[in-house]
Amino acid sequence: MSAIENFDAHTPMMQQYLKLKAQHPEILLFYRMGDFYELFYDDAKRASQLLDISLTKRGASAGEPIPMAGIPYHAVENYLAKLVNQGESVAICEQIGDPATSKGPVERKVVRIVTPGTISDEALLQERQDNLLAAIWQDSKGFGYATLDISSGRFRLSEPADRETMAAELQRTNPAELLYAEDFAEMSLIEGRRGLRRRPLWEFEIDTARQQLNLQFGTRDLVGFGVENAPRGLCAAGCLLQYAKDTQRTTLPHIRSITMEREQDSIIMDAATRRNLEITQNLAGGAENTLASVLDCTVTPMGSRMLKRWLHMPVRDTRVLLERQQTIGALQDFTAELQPVLRQVGDLERILARLALRTARPRDLARMRHAFQQLPELRAQLENVDSAPVQALREKMGEFAELRDLLERAIIDTPPVLVRDGGVIASGYNEELDEWRALADGATDYLERLEVRERERTGLDTLKVGFNAVHGYYIQISRGQSHLAPINYMRRQTLKNAERYIIPELKEYEDKVLTSKGKALALEKQLYEELFDLLLPHLEALQQSASALAELDVLVNLAERAYTLNYTCPTFIDKPGIRITEGRHPVVEQVLNEPFIANPLNLSPQRRMLIITGPNMGGKSTYMRQTALIALMAYIGSYVPAQKVEIGPIDRIFTRVGAADDLASGRSTFMVEMTETANILHNATEYSLVLMDEIGRGTSTYDGLSLAWACAENLANKIKALTLFATHYFELTQLPEKMEGVANVHLDALEHGDTIAFMHSVQDGAASKSYGLAVAALAGVPKEVIKRARQKLRELESISPNAAATQVDGTQMSLLSVPEETSPAVEALENLDPDSLTPRQALEWIYRLKSLV
């Protein structure tokens, strides 16, 4: 800022501002002045554009007018929300000195920094989505990645081995803010992401990170957390924790542990798979018609967030999964009773985070009290559920009767938004506060009692007690009786017909009343802070309770979904394979107006790959995706949309389904497709579920068919992954004859004239034709084009009548070896018998042959 160059020429207030701004050069500074937050110079110009507020000028400093923009302090949350949503960070600078006693500018300091990844205010957060701060580190051995949800205290780290895994983690976690080192090499991995923050290298130093984390957790080492031997992850975690402390300007007592996320603990899905399966976000970027939109009928925001974490990290530990299945089964008869009570619990998890940060507002404490009030009824209902996991959750959620009683005594039923508004602490909680309030609310009772007492004591019937704004409280006696005023009455004011006096008792009372409002508010703030001190020792137990309540909400929700949507409990088997009876697509069946056609699936070590053929729009992609979604649902412990499911171990789910040009990166559809295919061929194992749709269609027929053939061969023979391979290359239907473990299935259709009916039913064997022209007609392609296409198709089929069933053996592709076309004139001459023609017919034939040439 150019203003700093001529620092001494500025006014004292602007000097104070410039010093504070120099400490936060990269972010906006909200500088408190009375009832406004002001922004100056470049900050003012940026804020006026980002917030669409007026840019004005404030006098002059150092001889130059100062660009200025301002926002009212009471509306600051709305403006912060707008800035945070645009990826901006804001330093909040408050007046901490007393204007009455300050010489020069009132003392100010930055009390907190609001950034996209460290917000905890209810107004700034989306209640049903996690809001993560993340840090990324890279060295020659791979990546380190750490995430922190400051609104819950959830702290995670991982060490992705390669670029693809790191990209998948970024897509899964979708951080609101991402810290990276100034020498980070893979900038193309993170470019274009929101909330990028470049940090100096020393913030990622490993020894500093260990020291920071041990200090935070009160430990001597990190062995107990299982992260001791994760140096890259620790580098990221250390930078992240320091950043969180710097922005919050307070301790973070709710961050009490860190967890290592290992690849072997969950089913791995790359970025393309998460996108294609539309788990929580559809291909258009919205939330409609996603798996989460069908499964998420949770009644608390923290339950909704937990369910989405489960969906993005399916677990492989069958003990955990069987426990969840058992719990869902046990809860199915209790959902109607439990959900209305759970709904009243609210977002306890985030309230506790604000409590830990000492930013909880009065209504947060009222909601916490309301949550505590639900616990006895919840525990009573759960007592009847015959399930060990449910009883474990019941114990973990606790009851907190003492804290409930404390908040019932301390906080009024409907408190105001802010403690500075007053009227938060309930009457009867603190005797001194009640006295100050009684004074502040009016002195009528006291003054009436004083008047009666003084009349009786002095015998003066004209004596009365009053108040005016200039002289304060007084005792008034008529001029006729003023000579009888007691000696301790000090004259305060003389009127035409009366004298006004003050006595020490009334003066003392006046001082009390005039300061009582300020005193009441100050004491109320003190008592409110003391409530934090009384609640915070229970923070760990409260966080465990919130976690148990969120998990209960998820499991009750999955029980309700299973019952309502007619899902079945899947069975886990030891060998690789998936057997599905009457499987359905969980999302498509909800949006269809007609009944969904259920289909079977059988994959096993002896039947590892299905070659799927059939018409466009016939249901190939739906069939493939439903298989992956059923597997995904099974591995979060949910029931699944099918009549019966047996499923073996799965380590990864891959999808190569559909593609679009990646214009921003300069990659064509075919390049995107091949990149995803390469990732699958490098990383799939015999325990992987692979969906391959239309491989090779973005290049020439020779190249495409060759690639598709080789990929299918590699997956079936070498990798031996469980594979669904949809294709329009009918040559691939010969694969089952050439290798073991491959089978043909197809989705059929019926064609009648110019119309087509898709059966959506999976049958064994290869499809007889692709019905491409019928689908084109259905799509509205002009009739003359369809007519010409049919004509051309007949010509091609007459040239190579067995095209669909040609033999392929690596070097020969007879479909592509099209014989030379025979002229219609030659065909006509071959069929002509000249001896049988009359002269007139011979002449007609000459003209006809001429027209055929």
Curated annotation (Swiss-Prot):
Its recorded name reads DNA mismatch repair protein MutS
Q: Name one GO biological process term.
A: mismatch repair
Briefly state the protein's biological role. This protein is involved in the repair of mismatches in DNA. It is possible that it carries out the mismatch recognition step. This protein has a weak ATPase activity.
The entry's family comment says: Belongs to the DNA mismatch repair MutS family.
Indicate which residues the UniProt annotation says bind ATP: 614-621
Gene name tied to this protein: mutS
Source domain of life: Bacteria
UniProt-listed Pfam families: MutS_I, MutS_II, MutS_III, MutS_IV, MutS_V
Which organism's genome codes for this protein? Escherichia fergusonii (strain ATCC 35469 / DSM 13698 / CCUG 18766 / IAM 14443 / JCM 21226 / LMG 7866 / NBRC 102419 / NCTC 12128 / CDC 0568-73)
Q: Where are the transmembrane segments?
A: none
Do you know which CDD domains this protein is assigned to?
ABC_MutS1
Record key words, sorted:
ATP-binding, DNA damage, DNA repair, DNA-binding, Nucleotide-binding
InterPro entries noted in UniProt: DNA_mismatch_repair_MutS, DNA_mismatch_repair_MutS-lik_N, DNA_mismatch_repair_MutS/MSH, DNA_mismatch_repair_MutS_C, DNA_mismatch_repair_MutS_clamp, DNA_mismatch_repair_MutS_core, DNA_mismatch_repair_MutS_N, DNA_mismatch_repair_MutS_sf
Q: Which GO terms describe its molecular function?
A: ATP binding; ATP-dependent DNA damage sensor activity; damaged DNA binding; mismatched DNA binding
PROSITE patterns the record matches = DNA_MISMATCH_REPAIR_2
One GO cellular component term:
cytosol
